[in-house]
Amino acid sequence: MSSYDALAASYDGLMADGVYLRRAAYLERLFRRSAIPVRTVLDLGCGTGTIACLLSQRGYRVTATDLSEEMLTQAAEKAMACKEPPLFVLQSMPRLHLPEPVDAAISTLDSLNYLTRERDIRETFRRVFRFLKPGGSFIFDVNTPYKLRRMDCQLYTDETEESYCVWRTFFSEKQKICTYQVDLFRLRSDGAWERDYEEHRERAWSAAELTELLS
C-alpha cells in the first residue's frame, strides 16, 4: 500500500479549502514572474488533485503525477467537474517521465519530504529539469528541519462528521526522519466505525542540502 491509500477518501475533508485556493493563487502569481509564458504545468505528488484542478480551471494544461492509486482515483472523480481536466499519471517522483516538456513544475504540501533517500531526491530533481523547457520554473515547498524537529512526540487530531484522524509524530535526529503514525476512523453506512492505520516518513532536508542537490 502506498502512503495515503487508506487516507485518500477522507483527505479532502481533513484539509481546509482555503489552503488550496490561496496556494493556487500564489502559484499563479509566481508563474507570471517566470522567464517564459506558463501554459503547461507538471504537478508532482498531486495527491487528490485539488491544486491541479484549480490550475486547470484557471486555464493551464496540467499533467499531475502521484504514487498513490487511491489518491489518483479521488483526483479523477474531482476532475470530472473541469472543462479541461488535468492528465493524471501513476508514477513515483524518481521515475518521472513525460511525453513532452512543460513550462513549469510544482510540488506542494511537503510532497518532496517523502523522498527520504538522497539518490531519490537527486534523481527527481534531475528528471524535473529534464522535462522543463529552457527558462521554465520549478516551484516547491518542504517541511523544514525546524518544523519536523518540533513535531517530535506530538499528537494531532482532525475530525469531520464521518471521520476522525489521530496523528502521532516522532523525529529521529540521527536519521533526520519524522515518522507519522496515523489512525483513521471512518463512519460506515451501518453506523459502525472502521479503523485504518498508515505510517508515513518525511526526511528533513536543509536549505543547504537542497541547494547542493539542485546544483
Label each region the model flagged.
Residues 1-45:
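Conserved class I S-adenosyl-L-methionine
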Residues 42, 50-95:
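Class I SAM-dependent methyltransferase SAM/SAH-binding core
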Residues 97-104:
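A short acidic, Gly/Pro-enriched loop at the edge of an enzyme's catalytic core
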Residues 108-110:
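Residues lining the SAM
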Residues 113-115:
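A short His-aromatic
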Residues 122-134:
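A short glycine-rich, Lys/Arg-flanked "PGG" loop and its adjoining helix->strand segment in the class I
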Residues 139-213:
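SAM-dependent methyltransferase
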